[in-house]
From Swiss-Prot:
The protein's role, per its UniProt record: This is one of the proteins that bind and probably mediate the attachment of the 5S RNA into the large ribosomal subunit, where it forms part of the central protuberance.
Subunit structure: Part of the 50S ribosomal subunit; part of the 5S rRNA/L5/L18/L25 subcomplex. Contacts the 5S and 23S rRNAs.
NCBIfam families associated with the record: L18_bact (TIGR00060)
Gene designation: rplR
GO cellular component, one term: cytosolic large ribosomal subunit
Phylogenetic placement of the source organism: Bacteria, Pseudomonadati, Pseudomonadota, Gammaproteobacteria, Lysobacterales
InterPro entries per record: Ribosomal_uL18_bac-type, Ribosomal_uL18_bac/euk
CDD domains cross-referenced by the UniProt entry: Ribosomal_L18_L5e (cd00432)
A GO MF label: structural constituent of ribosome
Record-level GO BP terms: translation
Family of the protein in this entry: Belongs to the universal ribosomal protein uL18 family.
Record SUPFAM superfamilies: Translational machinery components
Alphabetical keyword list: Ribonucleoprotein, Ribosomal protein, RNA-binding, rRNA-binding
Name of the protein described by the UniProt record: Large ribosomal subunit protein uL18
Length: 119
């Protein structure tokens, strides 16, 4: 990823996070790397992580060839929804961190919705 492309992604993410902060709801944030996918649910003010899931965890790794495809994203999405609901969070704002809503990001979001989270 070139520097300019990454800076543009971070600029989009900053704008989105400012809007989510005004809404005052919990935030489901996603980080995508070349090999793995991470998801975290933050409090409304962003000061505390309520739930987290990623492709490095043993319960997600089981049965997956690698952590960089849509199948892994679906597992992470279902797991983050389960953990957020266990913590009492039903409604979240989806922070895609400046990534396009496509591929792994979309798969994670759809799986989290199926798991019971409302965006």
């Amino acid at each position: 990823m070139s520097i300019n492309k990454n800076i543009a992604r971070l600029r989009r993410a900053k704008s989105t996070r400012a809007h989510i902060r005004e809404l005052g709801v919990a935030r489901l944030s996603v980080l995508r790397t070349g090999q793995h996918l991470y998801a975290q649910v933050f409090t409304a003010d962003g000061s505390k992580v309520i739930a987290a899931a990623n492709t490095l965890q043993a319960d997600v790794k089981d049965g997956l060839k690698n952590g960089k495809n849509s199948d892994a994203a679906v597992k992470v999405g279902k797991l983050i929804a389960e953990r957020a609901k266990a913590a009492g969070i039903e409604k979240v704002a989806f922070d895609r961190s400046g990534y396009r809503y496509h591929g792994r990001i979309k798969a994670l979001a759809d799986a989290a919705r199926e798991g019971g989270l409302q965006f």
